C-alpha cells in the first residue's frame, strides 16, 4: 500500500512538472535576421535595438534572432548561408550588385503579392516599386531609398587655411596638390582597402562621364566593349589621379571605417564616399557627440567631382536603388513565419522607421512618400546631402548594379592595380572584356 501511495505521489509530481514545463515553453515564432550594422556609426546600435524591440513588443508572438555584421564580414556570411541553403528569414540586401547571387538563384521571395494585398505601393517612390530595377526581375526586396553612390565632400576650413577655393575642374585640383601637401594635408581622401569603394563611389561616376549615360546598356547589348577608347580613358583617369598625387597611394590601404574620422580630423581637403556616409558625421543621440559638430558642418560642402577634361559629360554622379529588406524564398507560403517576416519587412521600410532613419542619418533619400520632413531635426550636412540631387545634371549607372560579379570584381581589382601603378589601363580593360565574354 505504501509503495502504491509513493508511486502515485511520484506520478503526481511528474505530471505537475510536465504542466509547468509546458507553461514555460516559448511558443513564439522565431524570425532569423541577418542585419547590416556598422556599430561605430552614430545612433546605429541604439536605433536598430529600438526598431527590433518595438516590433517584438507590437508582435508578442514573435522572437527576433538577429545577427549583426558589417561590410565584407556581412557579405561573406550571407554567401555562406546561401551556399548551405540555410537562409535567414529576413535580410538586408542590395537590389543587384553585391546581392546578385541571391537574385539570380531566386533565393528571395517575390513580395509583389504582399505589396498588392496590403495596398502600400503608392506609399513609395515609383522607381523603388519598379521590379525591373531589381536583378531578380521581380520585387525581391523593398528599398529604403534612392542611393547616390558618389558624393564629393569639400572641407572649406582646410581650403581656407591655405588660401584656396573649391576646385571647379581637374586642372585646378592638380594645382592644389603641392599647396595642400606643403601644409601637411592630403588632397582627396577615399578609404579604398575594400575594393568595392573605388568602383562604386568613384569609378562608376568616372565611367559615366567618359562613356556617356547609356554606356552600360551598349556594352550589355554588345554594341560597345570595355576595350573601346572611352572606357580605357576612364580607367586611365584613375591611374592619373594617383600619379598626379590627387589621391595618395596610401589610401588603398585605408579601411573603409577609417575614412570619416580622417576627413573629420582635417587630414584632407576633399573626401569621396556615398551619400549614406553623412550618417557617420552627425550627432550620436546617446553620447551627444559628433565627428563634425553641427556648427562646423557649415564648413562642409557636398557636391560631385569637378569637371574632367575629355569626357562626354560632366556634372554627373552614379545613382541606384538603395539597399533594403527581403524575405527568404524558402519560407513556407501561408505559414506564421511568412506572416511575421513580411510584417517585419513592412515595418523596417514603413513610415515610423523611415522617419527615424532619415532623421538619424541612415537614409538621405528615403523611398517613402508620406514622411514629415518638416518635423525632422536635420543637421547641416544632412540638409546638404538631401540637396545633392540638385548639384548634378545627369545620373549614370553604378557598375556593380548593371554587371554581374564576375565582371565587376575584375574591375574592382583592376582599379587597385591602376592606383598602385601595377597595370596599364589597356591591360585592365582587356581583362574586364575577357570576363564579360566568358559570361
PLM region descriptions:
Residues 20-105, 117-122, 166, 285, ...:
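Conserved N-terminal structural module of periplasmic/extracytoplasmic solute-binding proteins
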Residues 24, 39, 97, 108-110, ...:
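Mature extracytoplasmic/periplasmic domains
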Residues 34-38, 51, 98, 205, ...:
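Extracytoplasmic/periplasmic substrate-binding proteins
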Residues 70, 94-151, 165, 174, ...:
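Hinge/lid segment of periplasmic solute-binding proteins
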Residues 80-81, 88-89, 119-157, 186-187, ...:
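A structural signal for short loop-to-beta-strand junctions that line the ligand-binding cleft
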Residues 134-144, 150, 174-223:
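Extracytoplasmic/periplasmic solute-binding protein
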Residues 143, 219, 319, 360-371, ...:
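C-terminal capping/gating helix-and-loop segments adjacent to ligand/active sites or protein-protein/ligand interfaces
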Residues 177-179, 220-251:
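Glycine-centered hinge/linker elements that transmit conformational signals in sensory
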